[in-house]
Amino acid sequence: MSKRTCYAGDVTAEYVDQEVTLKGWVQKRRSLGSLIFIDLRDREGIVQLVFSEEFDKDALAVANSVRSEYVIEVQGVVKKRKPQAVNKDMKTGDVEVEVHTITILNKAKTPPFYIEDGVAVTEETKLKYRYLDLRRPEMQKNIFTRAHIMRSVHHFLDDNGFIDVETPTLTASTPEGARDYLVPSRVYPGSFYALPQSPQLFKQLLMGAGFDRYYQIARCFRDEDLRGDRQPEFTQIDLETSFLTAEEIQDITEGLIAKVMHDVKGIDVKLPFDRITWQDAMDKYGSDKPDLRFDMQIQDVSELVKDSDFKVFAGAVQNGGQVRAIVLPGGADKYSRKMIDAQQDYIKRFGAKGLAWLKVTSDGISGPIAKFFGDGADLVKAVGANAGDLVLFVADKAKVVADALGYLRTHFGHDLGLIDEQAFRFCWVVDWPLFEYDEGIQRWVPAHHPFTMPNEEDVHLLDTDPHAAHAQSYDIVLNGYELGGGSIRIHNREIQEKMLKALGFTPERAQKSFGFLLNALDYGFPPHGGLAIGLDRFVMLLTGRDNIRDVIAFPKNSKASEPMTSAPYPVADAQLKDLGIEVRADVDPEKEHEGDENLTE
C-alpha cells in the first residue's frame, strides 16, 4: 500500500492539480456511460472520484466491479469541478479526483442497511451490526465529540492541580443502592468481587492519603432497570478535593463545564450558574432537575381555594395537601377536552387522582370547575393568566402534586414550542434533604449516598430527628437532566457511624460493610468533597441526541444485552465448576432482592 496523502474528507481546493493517494470505503457508485463516479468515504467525509478511459482504461474496469462498502485505495489528480457540478453542501464539493490507479483492499457483502444518516432501521439491527452503524457520519461525529470532551476535561483538570488516579475495577460489594455486578473468585470459592458502582469510597480514601485533588474518567457498573439515559456500564467524570467548601467545588466545576462548552461547542456560558434550593425547585418546577430554558412556574393556590365549594380542592388542603397550578399560554384554543383528559390518565402514574382545568376567556373563565369560582378573577390573578390561556390544577400530597405538574410543565413546554432547543441552561440544585422516603420499599434512604455530610447546624439531628436534616450536597442540572451530583463528605468517624445508624445499620453490620472506611477515618481525614458528572449524558446533550446509546461506541440494548456479541450468554460447565458455581433455573431475581437497602446517590 502507498502512503495516504490526506483524508478523503479533507481534499479541498488547496490540492487542485496535485497527485493524491486516498483510502476509504465506497459510499456509492454511479455509472454514466463512459464515466464512473464513486463517492469515497472516510472518517472526515466524502470526496467524489471520477474514472474514465481518458485517465486509465484498467482503473475504469476495476471501478466498474466495486460495490458499496468495498475498501479501496486510489491515486489520482485533484481537479476543480465544473461550476454546474459544484456541491455546496459538501466540504469537498468544489473538487473531484480524476483517478488513474485503483486497488481493491477488501470486498464487502451487501450491508443489512444503507450506511447513511436517516435510514429507517430497527435499534436491534443497528446494535447487531454496530461496526456498520458506527460508519455513519452522525455516529462518527458523536464519538469524536465524546473524545473532544474527554480531552478538554483532562486538560482543564491537569492544569488545575488534579491528579489522574485509577481505582480498582474488582472490589468489594457494598450496599450502595443498585444491584452489583458480581465476579466470582476462583481462588476463593464462594466469594465474589463486585464491579464498582462508583469510585466513591476509594476517592475518599485518596483524600485521606493526602493527594488533595483527584480525578478519573471512571467506568461504573449498576445492575438496574434501563431507560434512554441509562446503561448498565457507564462513564463518569469523577472529582474529589480536600479542604474546599461546597462553593469552591462548584466554582471549579463551573470552570470545567465552561471550558468544555467553549472547546467543543464554541459557546461561552454565563458564569456563575444559577443556584436554586431543592425545595424551590420542587415548588416552582415540580422537579429536582428543573429545565430553566422556559418559565411556566408552578403556582400555589392552596390558600385561595381551601374554603371553596369545590370539595376536591378544599379536601386536599384540609388533609394536609396542596393545590397547585400551571398556566399554558394560548392553550385555551389549542387543547380540547379530549386532549386534556389524555394527560389526566397519564399523570395517574404519579399517584394523582385527576386533573382539573379552566380556560380563561375575555368574559371570565370556563370549564368543568368554573361554576365553583364565580368569575374566577382572584384565581386568574393569582396564577398570572390572561385571556386565551389554559390553567391546569392538581390537588394532592406535595410530592404527587410536584411530580404530576413537573411532568405536565415539561410536556406542554415542548408541545407549545416554549423551549429553545439550541439553548444550554445550567443550574445548581442545593440544600437537599439528607434523607428521602422511598414509597416502593417503605423506608427512609439517603437522598444521595450515606457518606454525605449534613449541614453543620443539622449534625445534632442525627441523634434526634435525622429525617429533618439537610445535606451539604449539590446537583448540577442541564436542560432538565441531572448532569452530575456531589457533596461534602463525612470525614469524622462518629458522624459516619450515626449516619449509618439512622439508616438502620447495627454497629456490627456497619463494620462488616464499611469497616475499612470507618477504620480509615480514625487516622486524620481532611474535610473533603467532590462531584461526579455523567459523561455519557453530557455527550448526549451536547450532540442533541435523546438516547445515550448513540454516544457510546458499543452500548447495551434496553434489556442490558449486546446483540453483536450475544452477551450475556451461558458459559461452559467446566468454567462454572472451576468457580464452584451451580446455575439454578428456579430463581426469581426480583424476589431474591426484596428488602435490599437503597443507598443510591
UniProtKB/Swiss-Prot annotation:
Question: What gene name is listed for this protein?
Answer: aspS
**InterPro entries annotated for this entry?**
Aa-tRNA-synt_II, aa-tRNA-synth_II, aa-tRNA-synth_II/BPL/LPL, Asp-tRNA-ligase_1, Asp-tRNA-ligase_1_N, Asp/Asn-tRNA-synth_IIb, AspRS_core, GAD-like_sf
Identify the stretch(es) annotated as Aspartate.
200-203
Describe the protein's quaternary organization and the partners it interacts with: Homodimer.
Q: Please give the name of this protein.
A: Aspartate--tRNA ligase
The record's disulfide annotation reads none
A Gene Ontology molecular function term for this protein is: transferase activity
Which subcellular locations apply to this protein? Cytoplasm
Gene Ontology cellular component annotations, sorted alphabetically: cytoplasm
Residues the entry annotates as binding L-aspartate: 176, 222, 448, 489
Which keywords does the record carry?
Aminoacyl-tRNA synthetase, ATP-binding, Cytoplasm, Ligase, Nucleotide-binding, Protein biosynthesis
Task: Provide the top EC class.
Answer: ligase
User: What does the similarity note say?
Assistant: Belongs to the class-II aminoacyl-tRNA synthetase family. Type 1 subfamily.
